[in-house]
Curated annotation (Swiss-Prot):
It comes from Aromatoleum aromaticum (strain DSM 19018 / LMG 30748 / EbN1). One of the primary rRNA binding proteins, it binds directly to 16S rRNA central domain where it helps coordinate assembly of the platform of the 30S subunit. This is Small ribosomal subunit protein uS8. It holds the Pfam family Ribosomal_S8. Belongs to the universal ribosomal protein uS8 family. GO terms for cellular component: ribonucleoprotein complex; ribosome. It comes from the Bacteria.
Length: 131
């Protein structure tokens, strides 16, 4: 049976892994998941990610990050979901925690943060909020 929302599954695995103080979490790989992991790494929310073959299928390993024994990601939540897609123009993109967090946005120019999308004057689908 196929998964209805693989991105929500990815975010839940990261959230649960950090609550359990895991070093890393693994999940099935896709181009969108890799792009989201790259944004999280660039913003300093995770230590890194790698792609490995497991049983003939690619797996994405995400190395979680902690500071003083606490998870760096305090909140990670899905915004746009299969039942209710959320699209915003460049001027309407939300500011997460008044600029302290990021919104990850899928745009025609690729997956990027809300700040990069605003600077490039491009809108898109708001995938999730991270703080």
């Amino acid at each position: 049976m196929s998964m209805s929302d693989p991105i929500a599954d990815m975010l839940t695995r990261i959230r649960n892994g950090q609550q359990a103080q895991k070093v890393s979490v693994s999940m099935p790989c896709s181009k969108l998941k890799v792009a989201i992991a790259k944004v999280l790494q660039d913003e300093g929310y995770i230590d890194g990610y790698s792609i490995r073959e497991a049983g003939g299928k690619p797996e994405l390993d995400v190395a979680l990050k902690y500071y003083a024994g606490r998870p760096v990601i305090e909140r990670i939540e899905r915004v746009s979901r299969p039942g209710l897609r959320v699209y915003k123009g460049s001027g309407d993109l939300p500011r997460v925690m008044n600029g302290l967090g990021v919104a990850i946005v899928s745009t025609p120019r690729g997956v990027m943060t809300d700040r990069a999308a605003r600077a490039g004057r491009v809108g898109g689908e708001v995938i999730c909020y991270v703080a």
